[in-house]
Amino acid sequence: MVTSRAGEIAQSEIRRNNLSRMLSELHLRGPLTRSELAAILRLNRSTVASLIAELAARGLVWERSRDKPAPQPTPGRPSPVVEICREGPAALALELSTDWIRAAVIGLGAFVAVSVSKDLSLASSTPEQAVDEAHDLVGPILARLDHGPRVAAIGVSAPGAIRAEDGYIYHAPNLGWRDVPLGSMIGSRFADLGVPVFVGNDAHLAASAEHMRGSGRGTADFICLWGEGGIGAGIVVGGKSLSGAAGYAGEVGHMAVDPEGAECRCGSHGCWETEVGEEALLRRSGRDPKGGSAAVADLLEAAGKGEGGALAAMAESGRWLGIGIAGLVNVFNPSRVALGGLYARIDPYAHDALVNELDCRAMPAPRAMVELTTASLGADALLLGAAELALAPILRDPATVPLPGDAAAISSRRRARPPSYGWTLTPAEARR
């Protein structure tokens, strides 16, 4: 009896694992035929059919006919494809940045149902005001989803040292926030949704999205440097995100590069951020260091016109970027480093100075292996990363999504065509 019970548990765990594998493949690869799923997962066709049926019953996938013929047509009827159900569970993704708030409802497969943004200086706002602004921003977009995806979780991207287990912000220097229980605040303000809340560091989430869908795809060792006001890093080692003991890893902006340097917002002196952050860039160009995104846009326009002061400021920031990146290359030996946010935008003007410094300071062996690129998902990397964080529990265990009781509704959903609203984000669209 004990052996039989143990066997049942083992079979149940195997099935849950296979459901997770199948849903994850569809989430990342897009529509696949049953034959393709069988080959990828190395499962027999009857098992694949059974898994598809359960995922469909849970409202996670559906089957449809091919819109286009297969590259190599085969005799008989065209094979239907299995794809993510766009009316299934989705994440409410929130991005809290220094100069704006963005929100989107994003489903499995990176399907963006709706998004909205508002320019707002969070550095001049209290955490309570920021959460209220986010709630007010989100209300109208949720009202547009009467017949669309259902929000199953909230994912939040924010700068600073954030405790992974509960979304507690220990310190966000660029927002002026310290000891902020952001996760519980979001949960209370959005209590009407009745869903779990997940909060992550912006650079970590950007790296996650880029590693899964963008510039880091196909690499096991990857670093994404991200920042607007400051700079942070998301680090992937051996295919896994490096978060540290409590989730605080990656605060590379506060590495000391000049002990006698300028005072940093964190309270130390000579942090890397004081040389490569937004304020340093604007100050070098003769602009108001507190000018924010509008001043950066003006600087980029001036650089595009060949203005000497703007180009010199970019080059000096590039030099300091190279100094810091060389240290990261020496320590982590990544195969690829991607620049995102502000650093992707200034790269055309800072690139040569950055590479020159990197070549001089990185050890020859790890330098020879690393590719320097820009983040391909653009500004949407943070929202996509927040959505991935929120949807991860469903991907790990699709069986947690309840089975609806209406068999007719399940059958209808299997046959239905995808709705016409929304879009699936691709790297090409992210560069628009």
Label every model-predicted segment.
Residues 1-78, 83-117, 123-150, 260, ...:
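ATP-binding/phosphotransfer module of carbohydrate and carboxylate kinases, centering on a glycine-rich
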Residues 28-29, 213, 228:
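Short helix-capping/turn signature of helix-turn-helix
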Residues 81, 91-95, 151-155, 222-226, ...:
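Short glycine-aspartate micro-motif
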Residues 107, 164, 236:
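Short, acidic, Ser/Thr-enriched surface-loop or helix-capping motifs
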Residues 112-221, 348-360:
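Glycine-rich phosphate-binding loop and adjoining helix at the ATP-binding site
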Residues 158, 227-229, 278, 341-342:
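Short secondary-structure boundary segments
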Residues 203-204, 231, 339:
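AAA+ ATPase active-site-proximal loops
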Residues 217-275, 423-427:
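Glycine-rich phosphate-binding loop of actin/hexokinase-like ATP-binding domains
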